[in-house]
């Protein structure tokens, strides 16, 4: 199957957030509560249009991906989150960005919520063991 051209792909925004709660929560708990609060506020169709995904969550801070046309609705849905695992909690959006890297640099300076792996580039023209 062919990939979509870059001009036809949906554009995304990345929201950096912090969770303020009585007890620590895991990534799965956050995903469940974010989708639940979005669905109750916006309805199933608009929640689907928002395309909300939790990319990373660590030590109370994380990154959520959403559609660029639905950032306001996503922020509103995140503001309605009041409980995680039955304990009082609130989700505070620190800011929005067009790339994960910039969201991490600007809003999550001391956290490693989303660190892509760095792979070494190898020169495929050289054969191993052969001296030039």
Swiss-Prot record:
Keyword Transmembrane helix: no
Subcellular location: Cytoplasm
Family annotation (Pfam families): RNase_P_Rpp14
Biological processes annotated in GO: tRNA 5'-leader removal
Cystine pairs: none
First-level EC class: hydrolase
GO cellular component: cytoplasm; ribonuclease P complex
Catalysis: reaction(s): Endonucleolytic cleavage of RNA, removing 5'-extranucleotides from tRNA precursor
The protein's Enzyme Commission number: 3.1.26.5
Quaternary structure and interacting proteins, as annotated: Consists of a catalytic RNA component and at least 4-5 protein subunits.
Family: Belongs to the eukaryotic/archaeal RNase P protein component 2 family.
Chain's role: Part of ribonuclease P, a protein complex that generates mature tRNA molecules by cleaving their 5'-ends.
Protein name in the entry: Ribonuclease P protein component 2
Organism, scientific name: Methanosarcina acetivorans (strain ATCC 35395 / DSM 2834 / JCM 12185 / C2A)
